[in-house]
């Protein structure tokens, strides 16, 4: 693949975190680096193990493949390969691949002299994943509390965890996470729609300027966060959506063991409600 006109001057040595110049090269448009190699290794090994696990189950139906965590009786110990050990190895591979990918992003940022906003944003998603399969099981004393790798089995796990706390949507951190996901979608959909409407004119028309974009939102809601501000806002919303997702699950079990509706009893017990007001004169 041919380089774009400006790419060659940015393809310089240096900026690596590990390995020096050993893996400091590109394959086509893709920068490799040491962490590109480790990403490929972990991703390939994890994928092969998933398919091997599927072969042991006798199905390659993507809906039915299920790589389950060990039984709770194994606690935090190692399980036999076909009794949860495979899940443990695949979890290591997935974690290694995700972290390697983030560190590869760091190396690219260092080469270009950019900030680390992209790897930090990706780190929020990694933390959410690790909370589900590492941090929460550690706090609850068994790897069996992690979620299985499979489409239907994963959905069953989500349903079972929800019912274990009666109504999971009463979890206040879950409320925040869902709100942030929807708000992120709304903010970036509005932003994307605005840019397309301003910068993708019909044939023969001129593209509009950022002043048009700012004026639209001032007319629309009375305020414009600005062309840079909308990206800061979207970044903040998206990161918080991932982090509050991690918080909502890690407090379910290690911190709060009852049904989530019971958590709201503090609201009913607040003194502001007081005693019922007596009716005067039968009115």
Swiss-Prot record:
> Does the keyword Membrane belong to this entry?
yes
**Membrane topology, from the record:** Multi-pass membrane protein
Transmembrane regions: 33-56, 85-113, 116-141, 171-200, 226-252
Query: What would be an example GO MF term here?
Result: electron transporter, transferring electrons within the cyclic electron transport pathway of photosynthesis activity
Principal subcellular localization: membrane
Residues at which (7R,8Z)-bacteriochlorophyll b binds: 154, 174
Q: Do you know which InterPro entries this protein is assigned to?
A: Photo_II_D1/D2_sf, Photo_RC_L, Photo_RC_L/M, Photo_RC_L/M_CS
Q: What are the binding positions for a ubiquinone in this chain? A: 217
One Gene Ontology term of the biological-process aspect is: photosynthetic electron transport in photosystem II
So which domain of life are we looking at?
Bacteria
Which compartments does it reside in? Cellular chromatophore membrane
Please tell me one Gene Ontology term that the record gives under cellular component. plasma membrane-derived chromatophore membrane
Which keywords does the record carry?
A: Bacteriochlorophyll, Chlorophyll, Chromophore, Electron transport, Iron, Magnesium, Membrane, Metal-binding, Photosynthesis, Reaction center, Transmembrane, Transmembrane helix, Transport
SUPFAM superfamilies assigned to the protein according to its UniProt record, in alphabetical order: Bacterial photosystem II reaction centre, L and M subunits
Enumerate the residues binding Fe cation: 191, 231
Q: What does this protein do?
A: The reaction center is a membrane-bound complex that mediates the initial photochemical event in the electron transfer process of photosynthesis.
As for family, the record states:
Belongs to the reaction center PufL/M/PsbA/D family.
Relate the assembly described in the record. Reaction center is composed of four bacteriochlorophylls, two bacteriopheophytins, two ubiquinones, one iron, and three highly hydrophobic polypeptide chains (designated L, M, and H).
Kindly provide the name given to this protein in its UniProt entry: Reaction center protein L chain
Which organism does this sequence originate in? Roseobacter denitrificans (strain ATCC 33942 / OCh 114) (Erythrobacter sp. (strain OCh 114))
Which gene carries the instructions for this protein? pufL
């Amino acid at each position: 693949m041919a380089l774009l006109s400006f790419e060659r001057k940015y393809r310089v040595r240096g900026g690596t975190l590990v390995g020096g110049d050993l893996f400091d090269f590109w394959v086509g448009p893709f920068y490799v680096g040491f962490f590109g190699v480790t990403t490929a290794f972990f991703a390939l090994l994890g994928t092969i193990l998933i398919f091997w696990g599927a072969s042991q189950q006798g199905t390659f139906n993507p809906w039915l493949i299920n790589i389950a965590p060990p039984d709770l009786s194994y606690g935090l110990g190692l399980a036999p390969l076909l009794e949860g050990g495979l899940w443990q190895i695949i979890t290591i591979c997935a974690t290694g691949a995700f972290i390697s990918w983030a560190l590869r992003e760091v190396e690219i940022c260092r080469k270009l002299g950019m900030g680390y906003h992209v790897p930090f944003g990706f780190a929020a998603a990694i933390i959410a994943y690790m909370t589900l399969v590492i941090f929460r099981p550690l706090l609850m004393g068994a790897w069996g509390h992690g979620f299985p790798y499979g489409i239907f089995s994963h959905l069953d796990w989500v349903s079972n965890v929800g019912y274990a706390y009666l109504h999971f949507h009463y979890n206040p951190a879950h409320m925040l996470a869902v709100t942030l996901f929807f708000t992120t979608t709304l903010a970036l959909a509005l932003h994307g729609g605005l840019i397309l409407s301003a910068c993708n004119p019909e044939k023969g028309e001129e593209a509009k300027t950022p002043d048009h974009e700012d004026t639209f939102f001032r007319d629309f809601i009375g305020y414009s966060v600005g062309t840079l501000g909308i990206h800061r806002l979207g970044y903040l919303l998206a990161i918080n959506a991932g982090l509050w997702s991690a918080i909502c699950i890690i407090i379910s079990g290690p911190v709060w063991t009852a049904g989530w509706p019971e958590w709201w009893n503090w609201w009913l017990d607040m003194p502001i409600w007081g005693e019922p007001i007596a009716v005067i004169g039968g009115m």
